[in-house]
């Protein structure tokens, strides 16, 4: 018997086994790819449903408070642009962007007589209005996947100097996303008409934000805001559906003063 022939047969048998094994591996790989693709499609559907839910919650807020119609989308877009300037990783946080849309969800629990009052709120009404951040947190408490969005809902009225609400947080104790959003929120408040006052000019609103650095706002966020000011007129005009160059004249009683008297007085 030729010993070489036996060795060749062994090699051929091993080759056949390897081919069978390779086919099985390829079959498993293709099956896993198909499974992963189906899971990705299911995840996309889930993300779409989740985003629809977020948008529905935001719509409920705007439906209850007509004076802030489109405010949620505008502040979301301003905040996203500002977050990108502050820290691209922050801007990439999907949960945070949900928080930008849902920041005022707690207003659903505020009486319409307070929300839609055509004038400044009295002390008692202010106390009611100041409850909306914590009401919002309670409303979304069951949505575990919101993550950092809850920080924006809770803390978007906190101030760098600790004089905000609901918790009186100061400085870096305020979550990053909320620090970014408070600037975007104030800017939109100042450049939008409200029932009891007209919007102030774009340039003046930018100056008010700059003046609020270190008191109402995080100085680093204000610095980032100042850096994107040249790009803001186009975004501002598109969100307000008008030509660039300002929001129109300030209304009666909107004379010189700190940002507090214009933006932060708007709940």
For each feature predicted by the language model, list its residue ranges.
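Metal-dependent catalytic cores of enzymes that make or break cyclic nucleotides
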Residues: 23, 44, 51, 58, ...
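Amphipathic alpha-helical coiled-coil "transmission" helices that mediate dimerization
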Residues: 2-55, 59, 66
């Amino acid at each position: 018997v030729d010993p070489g022939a036996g060795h060749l047969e062994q090699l051929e048998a091993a080759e056949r086994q390897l081919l069978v094994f390779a086919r099985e591996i390829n079959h498993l790989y293709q099956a896993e790819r198909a499974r992963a693709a189906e899971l990705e499609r299911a995840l996309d559907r889930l993300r779409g449903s989740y985003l629809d839910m977020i948008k529905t919650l935001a719509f409920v807020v705007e439906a209850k408070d007509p004076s802030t119609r489109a405010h949620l989308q505008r502040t979301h877009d301003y905040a996203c642009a500002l977050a990108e300037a502050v820290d691209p990783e922050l801007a990439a946080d999907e949960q945070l962007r949900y928080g930008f849309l849902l920041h005022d969800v707690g207003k659903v629990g505020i009486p319409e007589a307070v929300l839609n009052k055509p004038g400044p709120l009295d002390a008692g009404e202010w106390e009611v209005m100041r409850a909306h951040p914590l009401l919002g947190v309670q409303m979304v408490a069951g949505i575990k996947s919101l993550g950092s969005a809850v920080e924006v809902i809770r803390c978007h009225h906190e101030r760098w100097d600790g004089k905000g609400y609901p918790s009186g947080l100061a400085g870096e104790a305020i979550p990053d996303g909320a620090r970014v959003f408070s600037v975007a929120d104030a800017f939109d408040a100042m450049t939008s008409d409200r029932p009891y006052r007209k919007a102030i000019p774009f340039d003046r609103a930018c100056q008010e934000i700059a003046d609020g650095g270190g008191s109402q706002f995080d100085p680093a966020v204000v610095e980032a805001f100042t850096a994107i000011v040249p790009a803001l007129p186009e975004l501002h005009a598109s969100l307000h559906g008008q030509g660039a160059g300002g929001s129109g004249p300030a209304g009666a009683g909107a004379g010189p003063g700190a940002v507090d008297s214009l933006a932060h007085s708007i709940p």
